[in-house]
């Protein structure tokens, strides 16, 4: 069971195995934007080399479970199902090299990886996402070294805007 934004204990599940694999290693909203296009998971790097840094050398397991008792629409992310009850594992699939597996899924057309681009349109999408997350998660004054390293200029600009001098 896991407790997240809802503050309620849920078992979280996703139908698409490849999307599930994207959660096989620790990362957060400051590393990627995860979405879907025509049923195919899409992962956009929020900074250069985020994909490799997050998944290389990582192992994970994904679990096939019964869909009984799962509800859709409880969380803000449409691919996600939740259950308030513990569920039995039907089958475990061990993944010994998550990075290679995800690259294989990309080459088979089952995953779209948008690697970081030094292009204004790409960076604009990422900047909008990061600003939203910094404000939403009250992270403007964070001490997190990774966030400060990649988004220090955005954080400084937000602090400048939020100090009240523009009112």
What do these predicted ranges mean?
Residues 1-3:
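Short, small-residue-biased leader/transition segments that mark boundaries at the very start
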Residues 5-29:
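Extended catalytic/binding region for NAD+/ADP-ribose chemistry, centered on the ART fold
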Residues 24-167:
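Conserved NAD+-utilizing ADP-ribose enzyme module
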């Amino acid at each position: 069971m896991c407790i997240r934004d809802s503050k309620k204990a849920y078992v979280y599940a996703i139908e698409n195995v490849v999307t599930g694999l994207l959660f096989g290693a620790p990362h957060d909203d400051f590393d990627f934007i995860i979405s879907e296009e025509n049923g195919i998971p899409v992962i956009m790097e929020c900074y250069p080399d985020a994909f490799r840094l997050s998944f290389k050398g990582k192992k994970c397991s994904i679990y096939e479970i019964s869909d009984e008792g799962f509800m859709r629409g409880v969380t803000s992310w449409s691919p996600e199902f939740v259950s308030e009850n513990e569920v039995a594992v039907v089958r475990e699939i061990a993944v010994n090299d998550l990075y290679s597996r995800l690259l294989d899924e990309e080459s088979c057309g089952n995953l779209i990886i948008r690697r970081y681009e030094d292009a204004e349109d790409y960076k604009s999408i990422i900047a909008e996402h990061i600003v939203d997350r910094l404000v939403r998660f009250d992270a403007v004054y964070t001490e997190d070294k990774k966030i400060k390293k990649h988004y220090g200029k955005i954080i400084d600009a937000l602090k400048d805007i939020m100090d009240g001098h523009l009112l």
